């Protein structure tokens, strides 16, 4: 499927779980080949994957989705070392190697109170939720190329936020 897509000489190649069903050796070979072709032909590539080890290896920027909503977008290295959105923290805590976890400041508390009704899509599971989260979905806040959709980063919250949470 990847070879057929490349025959069309696209400007953008979308790879949705493109190597997830391959064994480790074949997967490495296909990824190496794909990354080389993408670089040589100057094709933009969008990888969609649940595999954070893969994302760390191949991506320059990463976007994290929660229930179809963009929760956070940043340079991959920055996002893995210092995630801002509570869901990104939980996601990475579940899959990151111990050396990266040690470098991180703190783990996020997780609560499970069922699904959210309006407001923030992560409200029912967030350990940092506030009253405003229940009623209003957060905007996407942009900080010099890094974006996060969380009320913790609204102007009124930034001034008084817990210094241990970034």
Model-identified regions with their sequence ranges:
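Conserved catalytic motifs of ABC-family nucleotide-binding domains
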Residues: 9
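Generic detector of short, locally flexible boundary/turn motifs and exposed helical patches
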Residues: 12, 27-29, 113-119
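Generic detector of low-complexity/intrinsically disordered segments
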Residues: 14-15, 154
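P-loop NTP-binding/switch modules centered on Walker-like glycine-rich loops
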Residues: 14, 21-103
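Short catalytic/signature loops enriched in Gly
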Residues: 73-166
